[in-house]
C-alpha cells in the first residue's frame, strides 16, 4: 500500500510502498476514506511529541471502510466506521469508570502504531469504533476522531458549559473552530481570539459574537470588556504559555479554564498566573480526547441537524500534499482545516 512516512523530523514525508497491515482478532483493517491533518501531527513531525519516532506513519484523525474483520471485532466487511484516536483497553480502572480516554494501556495509531496517512490502517480494539452515520461525508467525519470529539468532551464534560454563558476560545484552528460551532449549539455566546485577520473574519462568519486580534492590546482585558466582566469558560486551543495565561486572566470569578491545546516539547512546562487562579477561585481542567461511549451524544446532534461541522473543512488534499500542510503549521495558518481524501495522489 501507499503511505507517507516520517523518516526525518522537519523534512518532507517519504511516499513509499509498504506491506498492508495485518488484522488483530479484536480489530479491523480499514480502507482509509479520509484523514485530517492535525496540529498534533505537526508536533510529531517537528520532533516534539515524545512518542513519535522516525519511521512513523502519522495520521490519527480518520474514518474508513472495513476490508478485513477479526473474529472478535463485532464488525463486518463493508462497514464504514469512525475511530477515536485513543483505543482503550476496556478493562482497566479508568475504562471501567467511564474515563476510557485515560486508559492505562491505550493504543495510539498515528503516534506509536502506524497511522492513517496511508491507504489502509489496522485498528485493534474495535469496540472503540462507531458506525459512520448515513449522509455524513467521510471528509467531515474524519474530524470526529480527534478535533470535534475533543472539543465536545472539553465543553460538555470538563467545563459543563451552559446556555447563555460566555465562552472564550484562544486559537481558531481546527479545535478552536470545533469549540465555536459546538459552543453555539450549546447556547453559549462565543468570543474568539487569533492573530490572523482572515481567521477572525472566518470565525465571525461562523457565528462568533466577537473576534479579538491578539496583536492589538491586552487580550484578557478586551475579553472582559465584551463579556460583561469575563468569560465563564475559556478554552486554550494552542498549547503555549501566552494563550494559556490570556485564557486564565480573561475569566470572571468562578470561571473555568480548559486546556485543550497540547503542551509538548518546549511548551511542556509553563509559567502561569497562579494568583488569578487563587483570587478568583478559578477551576482549571485538562482534557484529551473523548471516551468512545460518548459518541452517541454528539452524533445525535449532528444527525438532528443541530450541529454542522462541515464548515471546518477548508480543503481536500492528496496524500502527496501532507508535507506541505504540516509545514504550514510552522507559522500562522489559513482558516479551516485540510483533510486527505485522495490516497493515490
PLM regions: where:
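Residues in the short beta-alpha loop(s) of Rossmann-like NAD(P)-binding domains
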Residues: 9, 196, 263, 290, ...
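Glycine-rich beta-strand-centered segment in the early N-terminal region that forms part
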Residues: 21-35, 48-93, 133-135
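Mid-domain Rossmann-like dinucleotide-binding core that forms the NAD(H)/NADP(H) cofactor-binding site
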Residues: 80, 134-217, 221
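Short glycine-centered segments of the SAM/dcSAM-binding site in methyltransferase folds
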Residues: 80, 166, 255-256, 283
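NAD(P)H dinucleotide-binding glycine-rich loop of Rossmann-like/cofactor-binding domains
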Residues: 89-170
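Glycine-rich cofactor phosphate-binding loops and adjacent beta1-alpha1 units
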Residues: 159-161, 201, 206-281, 334
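C-terminal capping/lid region of NAD(P)-dependent oxidoreductase domains
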Residues: 162, 194, 228, 258, ...
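C-terminal substrate-binding/catalytic core of Rossmann-like NAD(P)-dependent dehydrogenases/reductases
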Residues: 220, 224, 228, 265-315, ...
